[in-house]
């Protein structure tokens, strides 16, 4: 009864610590305008009206682009134009801290007007509108100095950096591309994707041309990794689950459950091996006491394992097989961090991309409690149980700063682990410890 009241109170106060999608912030200084979204940081020069630097803000601050005469400079017969007045910053969805929907920066060069528009979404996409009363050239950005990773496609320009695994995709709609510049006469809009090499985001940015783009991009050295066929198979399966459930939170839980069901035979084999070893433990201890010589002791143990049909290494082998699989699954969930932030709430969590104790404490409690009971089920003595419990308390705190979507995966996996362990040990009639036994208390009369 008390536990129910505590949980009810915690659930009531949790939304206080949660927040919705952050607005776009604009910071102006003497030399530049900085635009900050949840995952992007743009630096625009005031005098030239060009993009100076671009950073992504997932997993720290990563420098993706720096200006090298390729930041959407406007050239008239090869001469760069400079703005003739202070740029104008406008936006949609004005709030106290910035703009909720989009921000536009307007540069006036006299006979040329240029507008950068940045929307508040997960796609790393922005727009550049050019309006000119005479023919001019506009430079296109590159994320790598190595031009061998450039690709010139119909209506598109691509630049890829294998070291940072970032790219630029610029849609120019029949603009003539020559030596890194585009010909503009009249009005022209460029759609620009600048960010990490994530195919789901590329598909959202350019859905109508996605297949053509990927076909060209995979031929760039370093664009693909050797495990991409498996990895992206899981990525698109998760995408399908999200479309099915209409929510990333439910998709994470369903994804975790399905994968654990598929991997159950491996886990069952591992657990069965551990149970068999537990049954042999009295005989193993007797052999260790009887034979002090390491060689004779090893021979006796091998004979015991052979007669019992037990392979002591099989449990570890099954665990080693599962580890890379779970690391791959973790990477799949992590892949969607940007989309967690812009895909609505899940139960009481408004933003599955947010991390920290205030967002993850409930997952922390669930994980620790589930791990506690799993440890009791699998332990033979209080000393071993305490070691496992201490680890199960410390280990989740290492994840507390991660996005809630990742912690949801971890917590769901821990709950499924508890359920599977309980079922397996019940099936084989293996008794674990009770809380009273753990604390060294006598059994109830």
Curated annotation (Swiss-Prot):
One of its GO terms (cellular component) is plasma membrane. One of its GO terms (biological process) is protein transport. GO terms for molecular function: membrane insertase activity. The chain crosses the membrane at residues 6-26, 248-268, 313-333, 352-372, 388-408. The keyword Transmembrane applies. It is a multi-pass membrane protein. Disulfide bonds: none annotated. Pfam families: 60KD_IMP (PF02096). Interacts with the Sec translocase complex via SecD. Specifically interacts with transmembrane segments of nascent integral membrane proteins during membrane integration. Belongs to the OXA1/ALB3/YidC family. Type 1 subfamily. Required for the insertion and/or proper folding and/or complex formation of integral membrane proteins into the membrane. Involved in integration of membrane proteins that insert both dependently and independently of the Sec translocase complex, as well as at least some lipoproteins. Aids folding of multispanning membrane proteins. HAMAP family: YidC_type1. This is Membrane protein insertase YidC.
